[in-house]
């Protein structure tokens, strides 16, 4: 049992986190989830070590639910479950590094290409894996500059190309086109190509957009990653990574200690997050995901329009939940936890309310007077 001062410290931490949870708009974390029916699992020593599609010695796991989650996204990303393998990660960074790892094992002499708007985890990944890489310029909307990609790739036309396609860039939610990427590389004479789609935020709803962005397996992706906590919602970071089975077989090793194949990046893995993601997709279904996106998109459009009416130059990419605006001052950035680089942005995720949006709009417009 805790000492009174320790209990007080714990209570104060909860109050602080609860207050901060009610006033952040700058990072993509869904907030309207309710997983109380799942709390009983927290009393178990769950560990999803090993390949989720193989039996293993340790049985306190949620592998069956993890496989359901992978199968759901395989179908959503237009792939046959028999041809695609995947697992639940601890977030988008692990998914990106895993995709790059598979690419390096396929093409050890490859050059990796990604735009300047790419998430920082990709730069970390190429350094960890010692992949030679080239950073490509972005268009003003955050999408990769295909002309610059062609120019950069021409220098290394005799070597395989690994490209990270952003399906919703970190700051502007710009979406790269995997079909265009492959066409550009073919035009400069490169035929050995691996494309990894980073769909951290947009993965659950991108297949439902009209027009649908080109990013999935039918559009030439070799691997795809998405985050579970950003749009579907979870109390802890999580994600899913999927790839063609042929790529995964190159890294597979049999481990007697666990009685299973080692195909994942991490050994011990969270058994709780696959249950959360399973619960989310079973509760929502495709139609629920679509309706949730439409609600968020309407609020994002309203927010951008209201800011512009009040003299703030805000904009969105088509079908984006991210509202881009000029850099906000430090007091606003601190209170509302607004991500800021050369621009600031706010992200309307499930659980974001009109009251929150109005309060931020009022604060920003008052500072601009």
UniProtKB/Swiss-Prot annotation:
Name its co-factor(s): pyridoxal 5'-phosphate
SUPFAM superfamilies (UniProt xref): PLP-dependent transferases
Name the Enzyme Commission number(s) assigned to this protein. Answer: 4.1.1.22
- Catalytic activity annotation: L-histidine + H(+) = histamine + CO2
GO biological processes: carboxylic acid metabolic process
Q: Give the source's domain of life in one word.
A: Bacteria
Query: What InterPro entries is this protein classified in?
Result: Group_II_Decarboxylase, Hist_deCOase_bac, PyrdxlP-dep_de-COase, PyrdxlP-dep_Trfase, PyrdxlP-dep_Trfase_major
Keyword entries, A-Z: Decarboxylase, Lyase, Pyridoxal phosphate
Residues that coordinate or bind substrate: 119
**One GO MF term attached to the UniProt entry:** histidine decarboxylase activity
Q: Name one Pfam family in it.
A: Pyridoxal_deC
Q: List the disulfide bonds.
A: none
- Which residues are recorded as modified (N6-(pyridoxal phosphate)lysine)? 230
Share what the entry says about its subunit structure, partners included. Answer: Homotetramer.
Q: Which HAMAP family match?
A: Pyridoxal_decarbox (MF_00609)
Q: Report the family membership.
A: Belongs to the group II decarboxylase family.
Provide the protein name: Histidine decarboxylase
- This protein's species is Mesorhizobium japonicum (strain LMG 29417 / CECT 9101 / MAFF 303099) (Mesorhizobium loti (strain MAFF 303099))
Q: Which gene encodes it?
A: hdc
């Amino acid at each position: 049992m805790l000492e009174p001062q320790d209990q007080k410290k714990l209570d104060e931490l909860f109050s602080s986190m609860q207050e901060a949870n009610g006033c952040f708009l700058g990072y993509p974390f869904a907030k309207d989830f309710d997983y109380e029916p799942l709390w009983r699992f927290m009393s178990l020593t769950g560990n999803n070590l090993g390949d989720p599609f193989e039996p293993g010695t340790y049985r306190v796991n949620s592998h069956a639910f993890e496989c359901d989650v992978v199968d759901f996204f395989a179908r959503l990303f237009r792939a046959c479950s028999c041809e695609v393998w995947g697992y639940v990660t601890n977030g988008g960074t692990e998914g990106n590094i895993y995709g790059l790892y598979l690419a390096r094992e396929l093409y050890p002499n490859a050059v990796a290409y990604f735009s300047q708007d790419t998430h920082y985890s990709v730069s970390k990944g190429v350094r960890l894996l010692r992949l030679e890489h080239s950073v490509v310029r972005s268009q003003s909307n955050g999408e990769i500059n295909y002309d610059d990609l062609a120019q950069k790739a021409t220098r290394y036309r005799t070597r395989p190309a690994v490209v990270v396609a952003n399906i919703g860039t970190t700051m502007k939610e710009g979406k790269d086109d995997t079909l265009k990427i492959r066409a550009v590389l073919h035009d400069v004479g490169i035929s050995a190509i691996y494309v990894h789609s980073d769909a951290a935020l947009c993965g659950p709803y991108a297949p439902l957009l009209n027009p649908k962005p080109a990013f999935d397996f039918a559009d030439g992706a070799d691997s795809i990653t998405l985050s579970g906590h950003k749009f579907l919602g979870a109390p802890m970071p999580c994600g899913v990574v999927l790839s063609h089975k042929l790529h995964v077989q190159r890294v597979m090793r049999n481990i007697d200690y666990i009685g299973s194949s080692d195909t994942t990046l991490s050994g011990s893995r969270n058994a709780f997050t696959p249950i959360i993601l399973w619960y989310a997709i079973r509760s929502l279904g495709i139609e629920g995901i679509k309706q949730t996106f439409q609600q968020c998109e309407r609020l994002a459009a309203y927010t951008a329009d209201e800011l512009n009416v009040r003299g703030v130059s805000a904009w969105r990419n088509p079908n984006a939940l991210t509202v881009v605006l000029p850099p906000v001052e430090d007091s606003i950035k601190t209170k509302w936890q607004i991500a800021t680089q050369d621009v600031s942005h706010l992200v309307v995720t499930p659980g974001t309310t009109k009251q929150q949006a109005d309060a931020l709009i009022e604060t920003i417009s008052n500072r601009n007077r």
